[in-house]
């Protein structure tokens, strides 16, 4: 016999302990990722020099494999202080890569996967953090039975994400934090802001996050005001004329909507019968005898016409962005987890169809409380139909905050709109009162930064209080009511050497702290393993001195096999994260549409057909597990 019965017990126990420790190591290592694990070493198609970027997943729900994807760009220049902008797109279920690759990010995708610098990107004086949320959106993922349903759930996930993200990147935790986005993010952003403010008040032991402002473009905040704005907007812009049969049919749909609202729908985030007002206008204005690509009004930009999808093919950059983000080398560069089984799609219909928000109230209900604590800027492109400026202005006019109603300077006296000139052209209007700013962009769509990146950058810098006077550079030609105000700059310019040196020291200290923390974990693990091995060796020597036996390997082999060590090494645990194989297809062109009817959309783009009775304000995908009659109704104010 190779081993006596006495030592066999403790050897088995200790070996089992060693195996458990080894099994524990991957989990520890996975949890203790460092910045280096997220660093983007190379981005296909990007011009040189490469910007400093990090990307990857952060787990927010271990039980259901909920992981949020982020893409972070470090600012190019430092003004008087560090600032971070968290950008979120709408949907619910539309990827923030829209913002990164088509709006405010430093790169735009051109033919052949070539990236070009975006003239007017928001990363000049601010770090940019794009997050695909809720879970399941874009590159984010979750078990297919665990999509979110309420706005409070979404906000809780974002707080968890930020806690973990700041632990990984502590150098940014004290930055002035701004949250920006558009469309359905008009619900996301106020909910997240409220959750952050609550977190700052309750968690005294934790460092408060300095939330300094919110920016919401063409936001879906007050459903009632937005529903009732469709007819006035259509009249103002000549989409239909009052008194016509067309107008009467649309007005009848509005009467049905009002009945639903009065019957308890005032607190709903969306109401199906009210969504049909815009649907009816699009139906009534459709010209089926026109060229197939010019039959329907583009709901995101009324200056444009589209096929029967009425704007779902827009913006045109999407034809380049989608195949780029599905490329295997791009997926690898962005550190996409292998648990993410499906290729990137702009909008996920499964996320949208589950996110009903039936127990959530519209963000407008508590927006005044947020404005009391945080400056808010709302901006609107005046050619957007789906979340149009008429509805936003009605919401503001009806809103009471900080001791007044609407933009009144005193009871009955309104703060006047100020003309905004940018680089010699009329850019829009600017209006402020009691911590709220409202900006209208002339000749602009649902995605204002897509149309005017330089103008939105000027707006951002004014709102954040960036002043380049202390650091040099040519100021932008920007006037509000004929006055320059703080000097802003849109373009390359020198940086503040002192600010850069001070920040460099802070970054190095924070990075050293992060690396030290991961080193301490590795040291603890090494000590545990060394102690177990040492104890094994010591007991082995004692046993040999007291007893001699067969020194063959037969006994050891029997022990290892009996404990199932080989099986342990081969064992692989799989979970149903997403029920599909990874799709690396490259879309060389926008698929041709069949033109079979209103809202017919090619599944190649991940969007589903809509029938005449229901229309999605955004885009659904073939991931949608709901019935086809439900797929169309979700409000995807889209991008």
UniProtKB/Swiss-Prot annotation:
One of this protein's Pfam families, by short name? Peptidase_S10
Region of interest (Disordered), ranges: 477-504, 580-639
- Report the SUPFAM superfamilies cross-referenced here: alpha/beta-Hydrolases
Spans through the membrane: 518-538
Which lineage do the record's taxonomy fields give for this organism? Eukaryota, Fungi, Dikarya, Ascomycota, Pezizomycotina
Can you supply one Gene Ontology CC term for this chain's record? membrane
This chain's function reads: Protease with a carboxypeptidase B-like function involved in the C-terminal processing of the lysine and arginine residues from protein precursors. Promotes cell fusion and is involved in the programmed cell death.
Topological domain, Lumenal: which ranges?
31-517
Stored InterPro entries: AB_hydrolase_fold, Peptidase_S10, Ser_caboxypep_ser_AS
What protein family does this chain belong to? Belongs to the peptidase S10 family.
Q: How does it sit in the membrane?
A: Single-pass type I membrane protein
Indicate what this protein is called per its UniProt record: Pheromone-processing carboxypeptidase kex1
Species name: Pyrenophora tritici-repentis (strain Pt-1C-BFP) (Wheat tan spot fungus)
Q: Which residues lie on this side of the membrane: Cytoplasmic?
A: 539-639
Q: Which reaction does it catalyse?
A: Preferential release of a C-terminal arginine or lysine residue
Composition bias (Basic and acidic residues) maps to: 628-639
């Amino acid at each position: 016999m190779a081993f006596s019965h006495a030592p066999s017990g403790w050897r088995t126990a200790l070996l089992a302990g060693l195996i458990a420790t080894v099994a524990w190591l991957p989990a520890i290592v996975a949890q203790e990722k460092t910045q280096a694990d997220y660093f983007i070493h190379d981005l296909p198609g990007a011009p040189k020099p490469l910007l400093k970027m990090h990307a990857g997943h952060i787990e927010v729900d271990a039980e259901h494999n909920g992981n949020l994807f982020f893409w972070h760009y470090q600012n190019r220049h430092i003004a008087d202080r560090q600032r971070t902008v968290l950008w979120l797109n709408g949907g619910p279920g539309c990827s923030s890569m829209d913002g990164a690759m088509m709006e405010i990010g430093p790169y735009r995708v051109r033919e052949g996967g070539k990236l070009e610098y975006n003239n007017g990107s928001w990363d000049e004086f601010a770090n940019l953090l794009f997050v695909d949320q809720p879970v399941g959106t874009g590159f984010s993922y979750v078990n297919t039975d665990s999509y979110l349903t309420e706005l409070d759930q979404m906000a809780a996930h974002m707080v968890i994400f930020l806690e973990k993200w700041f632990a990984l990147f502590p150098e940014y935790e004290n930055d002035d934090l701004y949250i920006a986005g558009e469309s359905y993010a008009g619900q996301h952003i106020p909910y997240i802001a409220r959750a952050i403010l609550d977190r700052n008040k309750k968690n005294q032991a934790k460092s408060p996050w300095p939330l300094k402002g919110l920016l919401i473009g063409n936001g879906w905040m007050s459903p009632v005001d937005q529903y009732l704005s469709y007819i006035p907007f259509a009249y103002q812009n000549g989409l239909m004329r009052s008194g016509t049969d067309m107008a009467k049919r649309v007005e009848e749909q509005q009467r049905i909507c009002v009945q639903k609202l009065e019957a308890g729908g005032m607190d709903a985030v969306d109401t199906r019968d009210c969504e049909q007002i815009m649907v009816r206008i699009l139906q009534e204005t459709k010209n089926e005898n026109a060229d197939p690509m010019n039959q329907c009004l583009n709901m995101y930009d009324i200056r444009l016409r589209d096929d029967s999808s009425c704007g779902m093919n827009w913006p045109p950059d999407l034809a380049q962005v989608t195949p780029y983000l599905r490329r295997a080398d791009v997926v690898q560069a962005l550190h996409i987890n292998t648990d993410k089984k499906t290729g990137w799609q702009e909008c996920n219909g499964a996320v949208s169809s589950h996110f009903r928000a039936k127990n959530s109230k519209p963000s407008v209900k508590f927006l005044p409380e947020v404005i009391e604590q945080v400056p808010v800027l709302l901006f609107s492109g005046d050619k957007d139909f789906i979340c149009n400026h008429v509805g936003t202005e009605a919401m503001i006019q009806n809103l009471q905050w900080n001791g007044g109603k609407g933009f009144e300077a005193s009871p009955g006296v309104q703060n006047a709109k100020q003309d905004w000139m940018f680089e010699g052209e009329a850019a829009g209007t600017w209006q402020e009162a009691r911590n709220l700013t409202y900006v209208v962009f002339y000749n602009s769509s649902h995605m204002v930064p897509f149309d005017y990146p330089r103008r939105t950058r000027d707006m951002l810098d004014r709102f954040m209080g960036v002043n380049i006077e202390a650091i040099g550079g040519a100021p932008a030609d920007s006037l509000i009511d004929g006055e320059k105000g703080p000097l802003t700059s849109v373009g390359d310019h020198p940086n503040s050497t002192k600010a850069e040196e001070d920040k460099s020291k802070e970054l190095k200290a924070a990075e050293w702290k992060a690396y030290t923390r991961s080193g301490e974990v590795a040291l603890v693990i090494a000590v545990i393993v060394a102690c177990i091995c040492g104890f094994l060796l010591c007991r082995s020597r004692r046993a040999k001195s007291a007893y001699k036996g067969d020194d063959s390997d037969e006994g050891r082999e029997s022990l290892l096999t009996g404990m199932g060590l080989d099986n342990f090494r081969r064992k692989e645990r799989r979970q149903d994260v997403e029920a599909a194989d990874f799709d690396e297809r490259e879309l060389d062109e926008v698929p041709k549409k069949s033109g079979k009817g209103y809202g017919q959309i090619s599944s190649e783009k991940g969007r589903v057909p809509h029938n005449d009775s229901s229309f999605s304000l955004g885009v659904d995908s073939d991931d949608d597990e709901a019935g086809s009659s439900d797929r169309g109704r979700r409000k995807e104010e889209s991008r």
